[in-house]
Every structure is written in C-alpha cells, then in structure tokens.
C-alpha cells in the first residue's frame, strides 16, 4: 500500500472564518465537502489534535491533512445527449453546454463529457489521455460553453496535440465583460500561475515564478452597452482560466464570473458569460484545414438581448 500523502498548511495572520472554508480555499484539489469528510475521519489535525468542521481557523496555526490512498476512477459510458457538430473516423467536434464537466474527477465521477463520449463513440477514443480522459485533447471550464475537438485514435490525438503545442489552432471565444473598454481592440500578454492565496484560482505572476506559463489573449470589441462590452477573444495559448484572468487583470472581468469578478454575480448567467465560438485546425488524416462555428447559446443571446434593450432605453 502506498503511504498517505500529507498536506501541511500554516494560516496567515489575516486568516479568518470557518476552518473548512479556509482549507478549501488553500487546497485546489479538495472540495469543502471532501475536507469535512476528512475532518470527520480524524484526518485533519492542528498540533496533533483532530479538528472539527465547525472550528474557526486560528491565525498562525499549522494544520496537517492526511490524505488516504486515492481510489481509482474509471469512467463509465452514459447515455447523455451530445450536440455533435462534426464526426468522422478520426475525431469528433462537440458543442459543450454550460454546466457540463469535461472529464471525471473526485466529486464529479459521472455526468461528464467523457462519460457521454464513451457511450456515443462505443469506446472508440484515443487512449493517450488515460482512463479518465480518453480522447481529450483540450478542455474548457465547466461553466464555459462551446466547441471542443476530441480524438478517436492515438494518431489523431498526437497530431492535434502537436498543433496545440505550436499554437496553430484557431480559437475564438465570445464574451461579455464588465465596463467599457477604452480601445476597440488590444491584447493581454502575461505569465499565469496558481494564486498562492487560493490554489483554486489562477493569477498573473512574474515570469520567474514557480509554475509560471506564458499566456496571450487578443481581444476586439463587437458591441458596447455602457456598463458592459461584448467582445471576441482570440487565443494564442490556452492556459487554465486564461480569458477570465486576463480580462479581470485589465479591470474588465467577465459578466457573471463570481471567481474573478464582483461577488454579486448575475444569477441568470450561472457563471461566466463565455462561449468557445470558433475552432479551426488541420485535419490529422486529410491534412486539410477545417473550421467550425458554434451559434451563441440561449443564456448568452438572452443576456445580449437584455443589454440591447436597456442600452436603447
């Protein structure tokens, strides 16, 4: 049996609130409910003594989390409807709905895009991504909608991954951001890494920071509404939360994004207003350029309609 992994954390002088909430903010890999379960099992301690999920965090205190040996996750086929944009023997392009997780993970063992793909493709997916990520070449966030390409065999997976690696994939996202951008177009070029204060979040970091990765987002204004701006973003790189962090870093977070934007989110959006609209690449088998366009989903068009009405009033 493998030894248990330990996570050791020290609360800063300004740490406050419930301990389970504070720990969840420090550990990107553990949800609050998972931490509560570990506390009930006596796996979270302070100074060698077990803590309670209702305890308050103590500034300056050292906490230790003993993680049990992880149980293997095996993705199972599930008959979940898919919006298939294109499909052949080598790949499949999907229009992912908002709210769907791409692949299984602790806390999301099923109901994911991978579960749906395993059923739809009858197991014919590339194995390079491993048992829980078959066919997955790239990902988008749970609350981001839009286009994704998945590989059905290893040759297609390698060819698509190579294109992502040299940033030759065409990817355009549509978004609505808070505020009125001063220019009609521009770009954000930074390095991104984990936020040291909250491991679930990404942030702009110095180039020399541990884990720093280069990120470039180009943007142009499509429509202005005074307090909001409708934009198109073209990605050169595809880092975790890239558009969300980049737009927030210049003072224009995405509408509905309660993580990187205002706490008072827009309930009708159920998360950030971000849609992966265009996707283009060289087909691995034919070597021909193919490009796909996804119509804006209902949540996006309804919010646009509302903004247009309010702006004209």
Model segments located where?
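RNA pseudouridine synthases
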Residues: 2-313
């Amino acid at each position: 049996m493998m030894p248990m992994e330990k996570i050791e954390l020290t609360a800063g002088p300004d740490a406050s609130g419930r301990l389970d909430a504070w720990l969840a903010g420090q550990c990107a890999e553990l949800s609050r409910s998972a931490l509560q379960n570990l506390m009930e099992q006596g796996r979270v301690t302070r100074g060698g003594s077990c803590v309670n999920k209702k305890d308050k965090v103590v500034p300056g205190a050292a906490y230790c989390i003993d993680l049990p040996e992880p149980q293997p996750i095996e993705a199972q086929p599930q008959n979940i409807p898919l919006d298939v944009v294109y499909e052949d023997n080598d790949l499949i392009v999907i229009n992912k709905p908002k709210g769907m997780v791409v692949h299984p993970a602790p806390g999301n063992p099923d109901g994911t895009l991978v579960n749906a793909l395993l059923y739809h493709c009858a197991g014919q997916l590339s194995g390079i991504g491993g048992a829980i990520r078959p066919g997955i070449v790239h990902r988008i966030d749970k609350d981001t909608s839009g286009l994704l390409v998945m590989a059905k065999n290893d040759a297609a997976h390698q060819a698509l991954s190579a294109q992502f690696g040299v940033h030759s994939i065409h990817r355009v996202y549509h978004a609505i951001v808070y505020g009125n951008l001063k220019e009609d177009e521009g770009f954000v070029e930074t390095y991104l890494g984990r936020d040291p204060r909250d491991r679930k979040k990404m942030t702009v970091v110095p180039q020399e920071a541990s884990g720093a990765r280069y990120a470039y987002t180009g943007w142009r204004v499509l429509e202005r509404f005074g307090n909001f701006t409708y934009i198109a973003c073209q990605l050169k790189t595809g880092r975790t939360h890239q558009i969300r962090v980049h737009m927030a870093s210049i003072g224009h977070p995405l509408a509905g994004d309660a993580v990187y934007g205002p706490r008072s989110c827009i309930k009708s959006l159920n998360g950030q207003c971000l849609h992966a609209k265009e996707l283009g690449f060289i087909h691995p088998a034919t070597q021909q350029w193919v490009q796909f366009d996804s119509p804006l989903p209902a949540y996006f068009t309804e919010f646009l309609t509302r903004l247009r009405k309010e702006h004209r009033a």
